[in-house]
Amino acid sequence: MSPLTPHAAWLLWLLTVPVVVEVPLDTGHIDVARGRPPIDSGRRTSTQPPPKAETSGREFFASWGYNGDRYANSDIHFSQPSLGNDFTILNVRIRDSKGWTDGLFAHSLTVPQYNLRFGMFFNEKWGIELAHDHIKWIVREDQTVRRTGTLNGAPADGDVALTADVLRYQLNNGANPLFFNLIRRWRLTGEPGRSGHLVFLAKAGAGFPNPHTENTVFGVPNDKGFQFVQGWNVDAAAAVRLHLWKPFYFEFEEKLLYASYHGIKIDRGTAKNNVKASEFSWSFGVSFR
């Protein structure tokens, strides 16, 4: 047999090479031979939504800050039965004693007028707060006021000058109203639980005062010290809370408060008075979700 020519050898090699034909998978037709749709080997994109971020709004917080108060004039009633004294001084001018304006480190931590807050939010809107306001309520000396009632068993209506030897009356180590507040929260900017968000708070509540009494009536001092649950008080407040760096925040609050004090110790008797004030406070706090 004669040898293959080069052209014939090339043709024979070409005919013996296997040919692979790639057929595209038609996912729209059923595999008749198997009786079921063909298997789609491609990767499917999940239609399930990603898990939601925490939106319960539950949050715990605590803060410390300082306050200043503007007091309305007040009437103060004095009762000293064994001395025959039962009189009221009217429209008395009152002042506070901030302390922190002298410098935050000029006094010990609890000497200035301070605020202490603990609370929690149940959800994005509602929360509760325990608020202790260490405020100072001091009768201004060297003022002349109207007095009505009896003194030494006799009528004593007329004007009286409140000099140091007549009256020195103050809740200087704290009028100390304690409030149990309900809080409503509105988010103004930012996301919950993140740094850089701002919220507005409305608060209202009630409670009782725990004053530290210190006074002198007609030159005789009282047995000074703390008294507990000496009346009742209510408040309403608006505040802005700025969460600068998680979990820390600053809060600025303006509140109106009313307190009724009774059974305040004086020499051989008691006194009672009402406190009406507007109070501004600023606080530094921490919160945890």
PLM region descriptions:
Residues 9-18:
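Bacterial N-terminal signal peptides
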Residues 19-120, 211-213, 281-289:
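Short glycine/proline- and aromatic-enriched beta-strand/turn motifs that initiate or cap beta-hairpins
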Residues 74-80, 141-147, 212-221, 263-269:
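Outer-membrane beta-barrel translocator domains and adjoining extracellular loop/strand segments
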Residues 58, 117-216, 285-289:
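Gram-negative (and chloroplast) outer-membrane scaffold detector with strong preference
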Residues 74-77, 82-88, 239-289:
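Predominantly the C-terminal beta-signal and adjacent terminal strand-loop region
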Residues 91-99, 156-164, 213-221, 262-266:
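Flexible, solvent-exposed coil segments and beta strand-coil junctions
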Residues 49-50, 101-104, 164-170, 218-227, ...:
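Extracellular loop and loop/strand-boundary signature of outer-membrane beta-barrel proteins
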Residues 58-60, 110-114, 172-178, 198, ...:
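Residues that define the transmembrane beta-barrel architecture of outer-membrane proteins
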